[in-house]
């Protein structure tokens, strides 16, 4: 094991929380040697390479301090939005909750995304369906704690618009009727339905909800896949001790031209028992 791995292993053995951010993937250059075939493959690659890059540049002072929170990033890829250009950009995010016991993850993720990008608010946040036990159908009760956090963030002007993912007509209608801040969009996975369901289309049209498509897997990041990436990047680490809480994928689009200026991932993980 090299010095880099030893330092990273020592820090991760003492830290309680890990914040990992890829920076703008369009700035990765040599780090992006291949074009991943799926979102899961891209994410695994990003986590692994971010950890590798971070561990190769650890400041010796950090090892003496042993901070509770580790900020793991690809420093040369970090890119904040120029305040003078903010009005020309649309900043969108999709939030994936991995650890279902933490509704406060929503606020943590949005706050961190704003900080990373240097903005006061996000234009749009879509929340993926929270994790539920196998054999259990998603209900309004599963969504409510996360949606309430999103509503608070809209009311405090941290987010402009909020949306959902993979809700059928009944689920979307229940959320719409209950929510104070209504969903303005719902993503549909075309892998599971080649044509938009007519009842969902009719309901969305009636209440001015935009129907979007996506091709994310049901579970973009699992505890096992995160631990695998951690183990591959930093050998001999106690990877099973680390649990991802949430993952946020963002994109910054130039409104007038419809081109992506920036995209990346941010995630938070905690060590068990901390």
Swiss-Prot record:
Keyword Acetylation: yes
Tissue expression: In all tissues examined. Highest levels in skeletal muscle.
Pathway of action: Sulfur metabolism; glutathione biosynthesis; glutathione from L-cysteine and L-glutamate: step 1/2
Organism: Homo sapiens (Human)
Keywords (A to Z) from UniProt: Acetylation, Glutathione biosynthesis
Gene Ontology annotations for the cellular component aspect, listed alphabetically: cytosol; glutamate-cysteine ligase complex
Modified residues (N6-acetyllysine): 263
InterPro entries reported in the protein's UniProt record: Gclm (IPR032963), NADP_OxRdtase_dom (IPR023210), NADP_OxRdtase_dom_sf (IPR036812)
The keyword Cell membrane is annotated on this UniProt entry: no
Subunit structure: Heterodimer of a catalytic heavy chain and a regulatory light chain.
Protein name per its UniProtKB record: Glutamate--cysteine ligase regulatory subunit
Pfam families to which the protein is assigned, alphabetical: Aldo_ket_red
Similarity comment: family membership: Belongs to the aldo/keto reductase family. Glutamate--cysteine ligase light chain subfamily.
GO molecular function, one term: glutamate-cysteine ligase regulator activity
SUPFAM superfamilies in the cross-refs: NAD(P)-linked oxidoreductase
Record GO biological process: apoptotic mitochondrial changes; blood vessel diameter maintenance; cellular response to fibroblast growth factor stimulus; cellular response to follicle-stimulating hormone stimulus; cellular response to glucose stimulus; cellular response to hepatocyte growth factor stimulus; cellular response to leukemia inhibitory factor; cellular response to thyroxine stimulus
């Amino acid at each position: 094991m090299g010095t880099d791995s030893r330092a990273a292993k020592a820090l991760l053995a003492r830290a309680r929380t890990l914040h990992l951010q890829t920076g703008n993937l369009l700035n990765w250059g040599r780090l992006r040697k291949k074009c991943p075939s799926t979102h899961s493959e891209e994410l695994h690659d990003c986590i692994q390479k971010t950890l590798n890059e971070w561990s190769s540049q650890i400041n010796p002072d950090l090892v003496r301090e042993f901070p509770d929170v580790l900020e793991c990033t690809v420093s040369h890829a970090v890119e904040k939005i120029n305040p003078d250009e903010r009005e020309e950009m649309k900043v969108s995010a999709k939030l994936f909750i991995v650890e279902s016991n933490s509704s406060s993850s929503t606020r943590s993720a949005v706050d961190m995304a704003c900080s990373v990008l240097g903005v006061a608010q996000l234009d749009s946040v879509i929340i993926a369906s929270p994790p539920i036990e196998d054999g259990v159908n998603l209900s309004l009760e599963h969504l409510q704690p996360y949606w309430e956090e999103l509503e608070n963030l809209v009311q405090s002007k941290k987010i402009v618009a909020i949306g959902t993912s993979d809700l059928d007509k009944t689920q979307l209608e229940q959320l719409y009727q209950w929510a104070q801040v209504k969903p303005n969009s719902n993503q549909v996975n075309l892998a599971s339905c080649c044509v938009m369901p007519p009842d969902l289309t009719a309901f969305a049209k009636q209440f001015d909800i935009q129907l979007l498509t996506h091709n994310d897997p049901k579970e973009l990041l699992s505890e096992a896949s995160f631990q695998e990436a951690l183990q591959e990047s930093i050998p001999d680490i106690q990877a099973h001790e680390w649990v991802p809480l949430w993952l946020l994928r963002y994109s910054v689009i130039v409104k007038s031209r419809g081109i992506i200026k920036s995209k990346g991932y941010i995630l938070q993980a905690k060590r068990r028992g901390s």
